[in-house]
Design a protein with these regions (language model features):
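Terminal RNA-binding accessory module
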Residues: 1-77, 365
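Short, acidic/hydrophobic/Gly-rich beta-strand patch recurrent on exposed beta strands
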Residues: 23-28, 147-150, 213-215, 347
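Extended interfacial segments that mediate partner engagement and assembly in macromolecular machines
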Residues: 61-73, 79-186, 220
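Short, solvent-exposed loop/turn elements at beta->coil junctions and helix N-caps
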Residues: 117-125, 190-191, 197-199, 435-438
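A short, glycine/Asx- and small/polar-enriched loop/turn
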Residues: 126-130, 206-208, 443-444
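Internal alpha/beta scaffold segment
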Residues: 156-198, 204, 218-245
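Short, aliphatic-rich beta-strand segments
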Residues: 202, 208-218, 278-282
């Protein structure tokens, strides 16, 4: 066969899935072809839309023979929306794929003799998200529109409802759009940095109390009378909304929230509950989006930490304190580190709210670990829950604290495996691993790993 060209048509068999939801295929000559929205075992008639030196991308013209794992009762918007990855396959196959992804990273990247001992799938793969951020833009007809970004773009795709979010979120978003369109308030134009409303930010608690934040392009763009009318409209239309805020973000950036906040109504925060603990949550705070699975995650972390009465716990990348507060035992001495100042304040408040003795500082973890006070804590257990990039610049400093056990919670199997390999060189062996599906229907998976301090044998240099 001649070299593959754009617009070629050919039959392909889908071999496996990738984390972005694309199916992996090979031509008869062994050339790699990626096909979105396919399932392992699909046989398809494919149309080549892009060719590079090392791979091609195709779209499905027809499914000649569907995979036994194909699941067509998914979201009607998933092919255009960039939010979900696996709406088109069975949930059982999705869980299998995610478990394999973690195991592959541990063995291939970390070179570790360790496998996931249990994968915790979600009981509910729909309506689980307690947070939504809807970008707002303008239609060709000059009306404000909102939805989610299309895959790999900043083009807004409109939709009626999101299957994985709290169902009332879409109703509130539509109400906000109605209000701003009735008053000819412009959505944001990302190319020209013009317009008023950039996004609609929603959060809900266990008892369905909701915080609503409008992210604006300038603090001067809504009059006080418009703000009062907005509060009145929301109060009348959506009794679940207990607080309304304005956030100002004038920067030409992908960062959603700016630094300036104003509370129009309510307290500016909501209270949520996980594992019997109560938490104050502000719109800017990191908070797990899947409450049910967060309880599973923290239960595993608590088992791995095995804190005894009176032991000390250092909670790194602690956010609003949820990990440390949920796994703390009787008399646990808790110290937390969090880079976001408001989140660290929330963590301190949440410790008092739950009658737990905790001290929290607002610093980047790698900087806090240079502090003499932290160096002299001598924690019995350390928990880490870093961002996707992992514990960059901190692994050696964490190991130097000499804790008996480290519990590593990760949202990225690749950086987890990389860090575990470094910890092993420094005397901490990964001995147990579990995976929790915090984000059903997406390509993301959460992992929990227990590392145990290894006694150095004679002649062993761990420096």
């Amino acid at each position: 066969m001649a070299a593959l060209k754009k617009n070629d048509r050919l039959r392909l068999s889908v071999e496996t899935l990738l984390g972005n939801g694309n199916g992996l295929c090979h031509t008869d000559e062994g050339f790699v072809v990626f096909v979105p929205h396919t399932a392992p075992g699909d046989i398809i008639d494919a149309h080549i839309i892009k060719v590079t030196k090392s791979y091609a991308v195709a779209k499905t013209v027809e499914i000649i023979q569907p995979s036994p794992y194909r699941h067509e009762d998914g979201c009607p918007f998933s092919k255009n929306c960039g939010g979900c990855t696996f709406q088109h396959i069975s949930y059982e196959k999705e869980c299998e794929f995610k478990e394999n992804t973690v195991n592959d990273a541990l063995s291939r990247i970390g070179k570790l003799d360790l496998k996931v001992e249990k994968f915790y799938g979600a009981k509910n793969s729909c309506s689980y998200r307690n947070k939504a951020v809807y970008p707002v833009g303008m239609s060709k007809e000059g009306k404000a529109i909102s939805g989610f970004y299309a895959s790999m773009s900043h083009r807004i795709t409109e939709h009626d409802v999101c299957r994985i979010s709290n169902p009332v979120f879409s109703e509130i978003r539509d109400g906000v759009l109605q209000f701003i369109n009735d008053r000819n308030i412009a959505g944001y134009d990302e190319e020209n940095c013009t317009g008023i409303v950039r996004s609609i930010h929603l959060r809900s608690s266990k008892n369905n109390e909701i915080s609503l934040t409008l992210v604006l392009n300038s603090k001067e763009l809504l009059s006080s009378s418009t703000e009062r009318a907005f509060v009145k409209f929301i109060n009348k239309s959506f009794h679940e909304v207990v607080t309304i805020l304005i956030n100002v973000n004038t920067k030409n950036t992908n960062v959603i929230l700016g630094d300036e906040w104003r509370t129009l109504y309510g307290d500016g925060y909501i209270y949520d509950e996980i594992s019997g603990k109560k938490f104050r949550i502000t719109p800017a705070s990191f908070w797990q989006v899947n409450r049910e699975q967060a309880e599973v995650l923290y239960s595993v972390a608590k088992e791995y930490a095995s804190l005894e009465d009176g032991e000390s716990l250092l909670d790194l990348y602690c956010g609003t304190g949820s990990v440390g507060l949920c796994i703390a035992g009787n008399g646990t001495k808790l110290y937390g580190v969090e880079v976001v100042e408001e989140a660290a304040k929330d963590a301190s408040f949440n410790a008092k709210l739950n009658n737990i003795d905790g001290k929290f500082t607002a610093l980047p973890t790698e900087n806090a670990l240079d502090d003499e006070y932290v160096k002299n804590l001598h924690p019995d257990v350390i928990t880490v829950d870093p961002p996707r990039k992992g514990c960059v610049g901190a692994v050696e400093k964490i190991a130097a604290l000499g804790a008996k056990r480290i519990v590593y919670i990760s949202c990225d199997p690749a950086t987890l495996a990389r860090d575990l390999a470094e910890f092993e060189i420094l005397g901490y062996k990964a001995i147990r691993a579990s995976a929790v599906d915090m984000f059903p229907r997406t390509g993301h998976v959460e992992s929990v790993v227990l590392l145990s301090q290894q006694k150095a044998s004679a002649g062993t240099d761990l420096s």
